[in-house]
Amino acid sequence: MATTPAPPGAPPKPTWDPRSATPLPWLRPTIRIRLTLLYGGMFLIAGILLLSIIYLLAAQAVRTGNEPLYKIVDFTDLKVSSSTCPVVDNGGLSLSDFNAAISDCMDHQRKVALDNLLSRSLLALLGLAVIAFAFGYAMAGRVLSPLGRITRTARAVAGSDLSRRIELDGPDDELKELADTFDDMLERLQRAFTAQQRFVGNASHELRTPLAINRTLLEVHLSDPGAPVELQQLGKTLLATNERSELLVEGLLLLARSDNQIVERKPVDLAEVAGQAIDQVHAEAESKGVEVRGTREAAVVQGNGVLLERIALNLVQNAVRYNVAGQGWVEVATAVENGQAVLVVTNTGPVVPAYEVDNLFEPFRRLRTERTGSDKGVGLGLSIARSVARAHGGHISAQPREGGGLVMRVTLPV
């Protein structure tokens, strides 16, 4: 008998992220650009201040102590002409007007000299600013180069390569301290993950042998036609329990292996993988009265065929087992969407609360509360599927279907 799912332990996460990318990315430049702007801006401000001081000092110098050394007192027979100061022409000018014209002409020449000084200084400042920004960009790149090395190592670690280290050389500064701390963290993580995977792998291997022996002994006793009915019934029950334990061991071993990055990749068609999964659950679907349908288009990915087949088999098996007997259906579709291969498994079934969807991917977590019911499986199927999808650089998501059931979607890079 199905029970009412427990209420959620925490409210759903908000869909809006206040740290989402701004519509104007240039408003949030990289740290290298910001350092370049800082270096170049400081040089530009210093240059402007220096130019202003030089201009003011030059203006004061040309305006102070530069009075004419002579004064014309009589120009009866003097003829003066100037191409740079046309107003200096004694024809028709009085003596005082002529002296005033000479003073105005000198003021004009001083102004022209200051304007030339300012324009040429601005051009020189502009050229030096360009050089300063280029030099600042190069220096910022050199200063930040250790961060690039740290980033590349972190990306390699994100790909499940915990053996990578930064090993930064150089002076004992803040960046080297950061790199050394990061290396120490990677060392501890590698030891922890290695110990975990070794334990799971060894435990699974050690449990395989006695389970296989138990299965063989039970099958031999069940094949005896003279065995009592009670003994045969007990043997079938023990055989089913043993099979469940074998599935658990295989699931744990596969879960431990699938957390690693896939090294050897080969072309795998998701349509073919889905077809094989459907063939394996065909008898179970027929016995339960569940229709399996869908359109499967070619969707070739690079990966491990056995692990990808396990994803499809787990999803299709769950879709058949957790369905409506006699009138349910399962739809399996594959396609290539937006440059990615997609496997979608949709099924009818009981209503799944939205807050329970994330729990489906946790090991040994199922919607039913009983642990010894008639359901097959051990609660590792979706955990394995998620681990395998991540190992292939993809992801798997689940959504409740309106009216009951789930929509499982696996997305893998082509």
Swiss-Prot record:
Top EC group: transferase
A Pfam family hit: HisKA
GO molecular function terms noted in the UniProt entry: ATP binding; phosphorelay sensor kinase activity
InterPro entries reported for this sequence: HAMP_dom, HATPase_C_sf, His_kinase_dom, HisK_dim/P_dom, HisK_dim/P_sf, Sig_transdc_His_kin-like_C, TCS_sensor_his_kinase
Transmembrane segments: 37-57, 121-141
GO cellular component: plasma membrane
Residue numbers spanned by region Disordered: 1-21
Cellular localisation: Cell membrane
Modified residue annotations for Phosphohistidine: 205
Catalytic reactions of this protein: ATP + protein L-histidine = ADP + protein N-phospho-L-histidine
Membrane topology classification: Multi-pass membrane protein
EC number of this enzyme: 2.7.13.3
CDD domains hit by this protein: HAMP, HATPase, HisKA
Cited PROSITE patterns: HAMP, HIS_KIN
Domain Histidine kinase: 202-414
UniProt main location, coarse: membrane
Gene3D superfamilies: 1.10.287.130, 6.10.340.10, Histidine kinase-like ATPase, C-terminal domain
Boundaries of every HAMP domain copy: 142-194
Biased composition regions of type Pro residues, renumbered to the chain: 1-15
Keywords: ATP-binding, Cell membrane, Kinase, Membrane, Nucleotide-binding, Phosphoprotein, Transferase, Transmembrane, Transmembrane helix, Two-component regulatory system
Function summary: Member of the two-component regulatory system CutS/CutR, involved in the regulation of copper metabolism.
Stated name of the protein: Sensor protein CutS
Taxonomic source organism: Streptomyces coelicolor (strain ATCC BAA-471 / A3(2) / M145)
Lineage, uppermost ranks: Bacteria, Bacillati, Actinomycetota, Actinomycetes, Kitasatosporales
Gene name of this polypeptide: cutS
